[in-house]
Amino acid sequence: MTGGGVLATMDPVRKLVRSQPKIGRHPVAAGQDGRDRHPIRSWECGERARTARTGRTVGRAADPSDHGPSLYNFGGCVEINILGPVSIDTSHSGGGIRAGKVRTLVATLAIDAGRAVSLADLVDELWGATPPDNVLNALQAHAARARKVLNERACPERAGGILRSVLGGYLLEIDPQCVDGNRFLRLVSQGAALLPADPTRAVELLETGLRLWRGPALIDAGEGRRCRGAAALFEERRLTALEDLISAMFLRGGEAQAIAMLQQLVAQYPLRERFCELLMVGLYRVGRQGDALESYRLARKRLDDELGVQPGALLRRRHAEILAQDPVLKVPSALWREPYAPADTSLLSA
């Protein structure tokens, strides 16, 4: 990944933001007890998860094969977290940012790490339609506070050089990989690209990416359009990564674990047809044809009651295949027929 960051080309997110100017908070993922370290719920625990398989800490770049060189080689000891409450971690300290405007400013610049963000865009993000009369002075004051926070937590050789004022804007001069959102996008895209050929490695990458989450993305970054648009994008990619993870588990023959995950996800996201489809196939594969058909009936009822629509063509096709006991349902790679190709990677730089 080069200097483009999370939104290496901003067009996709700008379109999203413009089409949904009032994007709100994200729904919370399934499971609320804060105990399970499963990828669905690891970010609800409020701590860095460790993989049950290897014991590696996955909140930081412990495995070069997953993340490349140590994060602390990228941006002078600074790691900015946006997959949850906004925070700054370094090799010697870390924590959140108390001041709301400073937090929003750091988050907005982190979304475009390595790229300048214009003064106009920053003003819009911090104040929206009601900027103060002395808005540029106010922005400079918040930038000075943000620079102070970053400098206090950076290693000595980078102190003073992370947040820069450039012509017409500000720049967070760190490698995009120092932002957890970028690492998440990279990992889950790499994992999806391995399907269906290497489901074991795909599971490792997808789980590692999903465990970077500590809560809803950019949850405390304010209501500006850039942060809310990016948060909506991250949430969609998180759900897609969960779909890919479950498909990879099916490819490895892990139906029992996948079914348990899917039952939680269907309860949490009852209108997301892909989760229901995967659950139906999983139930059928373990000999629970009746439960698979009941899952379809419930999904159809929810869609009709809440949206007044019928299930989509793919869900209806799965229903017909289950009724007919179609042998295709037992084929390991059946779930990877078009249109379920690996997740789009156009948001990542080459």
Swiss-Prot record:
Alphabetized Pfam families for the sequence: BTAD (PF03704)
GO molecular function: DNA binding
Record feature DNA-binding region, as residue ranges: 69-174
Superkingdom as given in the UniProt entry: Bacteria
GO biological process: antibiotic biosynthetic process; phosphorelay signal transduction system; regulation of DNA-templated transcription
UniProt xrefs under PANTHER family: TRANSCRIPTIONAL REGULATOR REDD, TRANSCRIPTIONAL REGULATOR REDD-RELATED
Listed transmembrane segments: none
Keyword annotations of the record: Antibiotic biosynthesis, DNA-binding, Transcription, Transcription regulation, Two-component regulatory system
Annotated source species: Streptomyces coelicolor (strain ATCC BAA-471 / A3(2) / M145)
Cited function: The RedD protein is probably one of several delicately balanced regulatory factors that contribute to the control of the biosynthesis of the antibiotic undecylprodigiosin (Red) in S.coelicolor.
Family to which this protein belongs: Belongs to the AfsR/DnrI/RedD regulatory family.
Record-given protein name: Transcriptional regulator RedD
Keyword match Protease: no
UniProt-listed InterPro entries: AfsR-DnrI-RedD_regulator, BTAD, OmpR/PhoB-type_DNA-bd, Sig_transdc_resp-reg_C-effctor, TPR-like_helical_dom_sf, WH-like_DNA-bd_sf
Gene3D superfamilies from the UniProt entry: Tetratricopeptide repeat domain, Winged helix-like DNA-binding domain superfamily/Winged helix DNA-binding domain
